[in-house]
């Protein structure tokens, strides 16, 4: 089933100029720097507080939304689960909001990050002034398989376990590097 048949897709907040942080701001802005392509995650501790000029088309992010990075060399999606109130996505994102109860957000987020989708996007995406850009129509036309909810749940759980495993391997590699570096430094300093 086409993505636009199971979800609504909205562009991120488009500003008429530079966004300036303001302590008295009414909204927070999630930007590209706030998401991680490696971990497929996001952080909210450094969101910019600002005062937008909202239109009726702007969506505040909510749990279950999927942020899709539409600009740049690497397109990926991140599932939103917890976040503060009044958070807008920046213009570099599309916000994908499920409108069909036959699909789980976790499953859709996972599927949009798979290599067949990456290849499809490379083939059909356009080029912006300075970088590749995924057009909304291209994103909307992605075919999404709809297995039973039980299967979607299983796929989502396996993906969560895989992410945890990858995070543990990275932490282990960092600790090993620090240990071996320490051993080598100690050996070079105590060569007498």
Residue ranges of predicted features:
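Non-catalytic DNA-recognition/assembly elements of restriction-modification systems
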Residues: 1-19, 24-25, 146-192
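Sequence-specific dsDNA recognition surfaces
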Residues: 4-18, 33-63
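Short, surface-exposed loop/turn microsegments at beta-strand edges and helix-strand junctions
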Residues: 20-27, 46-47, 59-61, 79-91
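A structural connector/turn signal
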Residues: 55-56, 83, 129
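Generic structural signal for buried aliphatic residues
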Residues: 65-68
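A short beta-sheet element
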Residues: 70-111
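A short glycine-rich beta-alpha junction/loop motif
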Residues: 87-92, 126-153
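Short, positively charged
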Residues: 102-138
């Amino acid at each position: 089933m086409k993505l636009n048949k199971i979800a609504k897709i909205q562009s991120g907040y488009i500003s008429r100029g530079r966004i300036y942080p303001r302590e008295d701001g009414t909204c927070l802005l999630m930007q590209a720097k706030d998401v991680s392509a490696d971990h497929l995650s996001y952080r909210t501790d450094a969101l910019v507080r600002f005062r937008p000029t909202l239109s009726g088309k702007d969506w505040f992010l909510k749990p279950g939304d999927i942020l899709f990075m539409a600009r740049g060399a690497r397109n990926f999606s991140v599932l939103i689960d917890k976040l503060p109130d009044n958070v807008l996505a920046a213009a570099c994102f599309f916000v994908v909001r499920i409108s069909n109860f036959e699909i789980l957000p976790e499953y859709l987020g996972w599927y949009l990050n798979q290599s067949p989708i990456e290849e499809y996007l490379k083939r059909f995406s356009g080029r912006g002034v300075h970088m590749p850009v995924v057009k909304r129509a291209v994103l909307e036309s992605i075919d999404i398989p709809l297995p039973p909810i039980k299967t979607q749940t299983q796929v989502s759980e396996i993906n969560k376990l895989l992410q945890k495993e990858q995070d543990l391997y990275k932490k282990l590699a960092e600790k090993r590097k620090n240990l071996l570096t320490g051993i080598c430094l100690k050996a070079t300093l105590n060569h007498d």
